Regions:
Chain B
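Glycine-rich phosphate-binding loops of nucleotide-dependent enzymes
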Residues: 1-240
Length: 315, 240
């Protein structure tokens, strides 16, 4: 047991150190990519909390990402609040939207849950388009450089941006690890493993699931708000169904229910498309074939497969 | 005081009355056995008592409180524990973690939890496999693990649904010893097919047939009652 804990510390600490160190060796193009990947991986971790650890498959997480993005964006651009406060408003917006959608969607299960979350996300997307005067609809709006100052640091500067992305990723990653080791996290896993039993051990399963949705939504919103601040753009495409499917793909590829899976999944997918689009215009075909292959030969995702074959101790 | 009082319980499944006007009262510290032929409504009845199924009619009081409309998780939190007829554990988690999930709800911190878990595992003699995955346990040990999960919550009423089903003879003997240990401070409602076990551990036996209480009495009374024997054991087994 103790040795497993050491291995975990070593592996996850090593990953964080490697991410930190990468910025000194990467060329500018990849430097920007990795910053983006870390923010998207935060989004994927939020998704994984619900999908991987509670076994709730949502098809509407874009609405949470967008809640963070627009919560921050509107606060910073229209209401003139500072970037740190805007970030908090974004997270809060995601949590509130998560609480409302969770309370309603959790009345359903399985396929119905997927459809209900998908519908809510579409409703969110249409709301953004409807209030085009504020949101600028499809076009979106740019967050001015003056609004992107975070305690004096200019988030449009690539190095500060990398640090910011790294910090957000670290905080989210360590929070997830801590959560999994807390009684709350262990109860979530118990619910995933055998919900009926968890009920008959006296747990209010609905309450736990709702809290999980709220955490998941808040983390997704954190990623959304951070994305807007770091890359300076807020647009309706981030609320579209595509951005609900992405986290599902990332997590499936990386390994649902593993702590590192989301990061691995985003990295893999990002560079798969990046590299294959450099070689051929039919890059989506390459991506598709690889995805099919992975689902066939590593149905538990990359980290899930590694856990199954080599490292049983992976969280 | 009675731990559990059920009055006029009815559960209707479309045309079938699985439980038909059952009244039941279990005083504190009693071991009550519930027996009856297959399809008599035993599991449905404990489903109503534990809240897994809703009553079509009737009223249930637990520790003096009306719990007829209380959801199952709250009944458990009030001091019921329930073990499933079909083993229901967390297979991919360790034996220790299985019991810890049950215990944690009532413990202040992980240290307390570990102590409670260790104690519960010791009582069912599973301490030596604490770090094994629950899925790797033998069937008999999985049944014991279920009981340990119940015990770790220090319930006021422990409902055991066919705990000896599928156990080897030696394991059944161990189980009987365990019930004698549990009864010191816990009321037990036991659904049981094995008449030897019932005769050895039950204070009072309730016999269900076609969803109704056919007979209630001590194990000796049950054995002597010809009607019960006809219903439960079949005519051929009736001894003079």
């Amino acid at each position: 047991m103790r040795r497993d804990v050491q291995k975990n510390l070593l592996l996850h600490g090593g990953v964080l150190v490697a991410l930190f160190a990468l910025q000194f060796v990467l060329p500018a193009y990849h430097h920007g990519n990795v910053a983006r990947i870390m923010v998207l991986a935060t989004y994927a971790m939020g998704y994984n909390l619900l999908f991987g650890y509670v076994d709730l498959l949502s098809l509407g997480h874009a609405v949470f990402f967008a809640a963070g993005l627009y919560g921050m964006g509107i606060a910073v651009s229209h209401l003139g609040v500072s970037a740190p406060l805007g970030l908090m408003i974004g997270v809060l917006a995601g949590g509130v939207v998560g609480a409302i959608i969770g309370a309603l969607a959790l009345r359903t299960e399985g396929v119905a849950f997927m459809i209900v979350t998908l519908m809510f996300a579409q409703a969110g997307y249409l709301i953004i388009l409807y209030f085009g005067e504020i949101t600028r609809g499809d076009e979106g709006f740019v967050i001015q450089q003056v609004d992107r100052l975070f305690f004096g640091g200019d988030l449009s500067d690539p190095f500060i941006r990398y640090y910011a992305a790294f910090t957000v990723f670290c905080i989210s990653f360590l929070s997830i690890l801590a959560l999994l080791h807390s009684p709350f996290g262990k109860t979530l896993i118990a619910i995933r493993e055998n919900q009926e039993r968890a009920v008959m051990l006296g747990y209010n399963v609905m309450r736990f699931k709702l809290l999980a949705v709220i955490f998941s939504a808040a983390l997704s919103a954190l990623a959304g708000a951070t994305y807007g601040l770091l890359f300076g753009y807020v647009g309706a495409s981030f609320a579209s169904v595509q951005y609900s499917i992405f986290p599902l793909l990332w997590v499936l590829l990386g390994g649902a229910g593993t702590a590192l899976g989301p990061l691995v999944g985003v990295f893999f997918m990002f560079y798969l498309i990046d590299i294959s689009s450099g070689m051929t215009t039919a890059y989506m075909l390459v991506a598709g074939v690889v995805l099919v292959g992975l689902t066939l030969f590593a149905p538990q995702g990359l980290m899930g497969e590694i856990r199954r074959r080599f490292w049983r101790w992976l969280p | 005081m009675s731990v559990l009082v059920a009055k006029g319980l009815i559960r209707q499944f479309n045309g079938l009355r699985a439980v038909d006007n059952v009244t039941l009262e279990i005083p504190e510290q009693q071991v009550r056995a519930l027996i009856g032929p297959n399809g008599a409504g035993k599991t449905t009845l404990v489903g109503l008592l534990s809240g897994r199924l809703a009553c079509s009619n009737g009223r249930i009081d637990f520790l003096g409180r009306d719990i007829t409309k209380v959801p199952p998780h709250k009944r458990i939190a009030m001091g019921m524990a329930y073990t499933f007829q079909i083993t229901s554990i967390f297979p991919s988690l360790s034996v220790h973690e299985n019991v810890a999930i049950a215990a944690r709800r009532l413990c202040r911190n992980e240290k307390d939890t570990r102590a409670v878990v260790a104690d519960a595992l010791k009582r069912v003699s599973l301490a030596h496999v604490a770090n094994t995955d629950a899925a790797d346990l033998s069937y008999g040990h999985q049944r014991l693990l279920e009981i340990a999960m119940g015990l770790s919550q220090s319930p006021r009423l422990l409902i055991l649904d066919e705990p000896t089903q599928g156990l080897a003879e030696g394991e059944v003997a161990e189980f009987i010893k365990l019930i004698h240990d549990i009864r010191q401070n816990t009321t037990v409602l036991l659904i049981e097919h094995n008449m030897d076990v019932v005769m050895q551990v039950a204070d009072v036996v309730t016999v269900l047939n076609h969803g109704q209480v056919l007979f209630e009495g001590t194990p000796a009374d049950v054995q002597a009652n010809i009607e019960v024997q006809t219903a439960y054991l079949g005519g051929a087994h009736v001894k003079a």
